[in-house]
Regions:
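Nucleic-acid endo/exonuclease domains
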Residues: 1-147
Length: 147
């Protein structure tokens, strides 16, 4: 059991605390830092889990990236991919849905691709989600080369 951020060895209690509250293995310092980030940005837990899932797979992503207008849950700048975790997609109103579409349109115009992932997909299919994102990144990279 080591911290996913700094590789520090974790004791039983520290490991349990981090797993119980975030679902990821973090030392006391990085656990605290993550909780401050959540408090500040209202970050969904699944965004943190996906961020570390991507990191484990060797993908360099940013958590809570400020794009000048809003904070994006996860951004992969190399291929200009923004990932938003939909926590309450089941309660999505038509107004929120059209706002999401409009946001996606604006980010496309700026060269960014936005994908929205329902939080339960991250929770139950983390490995598959990571694999699909890596596939999307490869597709985007190929398209960038083609232009
Ligand atoms: Zn750490």
């Amino acid at each position: 059991m080591t911290c996913l951020e700094c590789k520090k060895e974790l004791g039983y209690v520290d490991h349990k605390n981090a797993m119980d509250s975030l679902g990821v293995e973090l030392c006391v310092k990085h656990h605290k830092r993550m909780q401050e980030l959540i408090k500040k940005n209202d970050t969904p837990l699944e965004a943190i889990q996906l961020y570390y899932g991507l990191k484990e797979a060797g993908v360099n992503a940013m958590l809570e990236w400020w794009n000048g207008k809003k904070s994006i849950d996860i951004a992969i700048s190399r291929v200009k991919l923004n990932i938003e975790i939909d926590s309450e997609y089941d309660k999505l109103t038509e107004e929120q849905a059209i706002n999401n579409l409009e946001e996606a349109m604006h980010s496309f115009k700026n060269g960014f691709t936005t994908i929205r992932i329902p939080h339960i997909v991250v929770r139950y299919y983390l490995n598959e989600t990571v694999r699909n994102i890596i596939g999307i990144m490869e597709g985007l990279k190929a398209n960038i080369k083609a232009i």
